[in-house]
Amino acid sequence: MKTTATKGVQAILIIIFSVIIASLFGALHNQFSYSVSSEFFTNFLFGNFGTNEWNLKNERLEASIVGIIGSYWVGLILGIIYVIIFLFMKTENNLKNIKNAILINIGFSILGSLIAYLIAKFFVDYKNSGIFMEFGTQNPQNYLEAAFMNTGSYFGGIAGIVAGIIYLLKKKQKLKIKRTSHNS
């Protein structure tokens, strides 16, 4: 049986891990989005996040910073959700299972972004998209694709938390079956 102090340290580690993974995802994801449309960042996200006032000389660095700012809080929320599950779930390799659930969550965010990008690329014309763009945007279709990628990653994250919880429930169920068969 783990002590309360050990559980508390592990809970903090889960939150830290979740925030770091989400931040890394945001920084890397924005590098791909920036490659699709730098205008989405210069015309929208940099102003939206206020980084355009920081006088950064490297737009790619700025895109990564925006990614971190836009995703660390999601990692914090997910970390708290997974800590609650961690504290009440009694399974073997509990910490490992939580880590895997967080990685599943990020995988779904990546998948959501990719699916949204493909939908924008092949099925949505920017003229009928309803996406607000600055007047004079040079590559509006690319802008739309980057905007869809951004939104898709959040929808993927929502699906990912569901998938992560299902994963944890299945792990718990397997342990319950395993314990029942050993007691028989």
Functional labels for PLM-detected ranges:
Residues 2-19:
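Cytosolic juxtamembrane helix and N-cap/initiation of the first transmembrane helix
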Residues 35-45, 114-134:
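Juxtamembrane non-transmembrane "cap" segments at the membrane-aqueous interface
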Residues 15-31, 100-121:
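Hydrophobic alpha-helical membrane-insertion segments
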Residues 55-74, 139-162:
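Hydrophobic alpha-helical transmembrane segments
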Residues 38-59:
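Perimembrane loop-to-helix junctions flanking transmembrane segments
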Residues 90-91, 95, 128-149:
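Hydrophobic alpha-helical transmembrane segments and immediately flanking/interface helices
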Residues 2-3, 77-105, 168-184:
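Cytoplasmic juxtamembrane regions at transmembrane-helix boundaries
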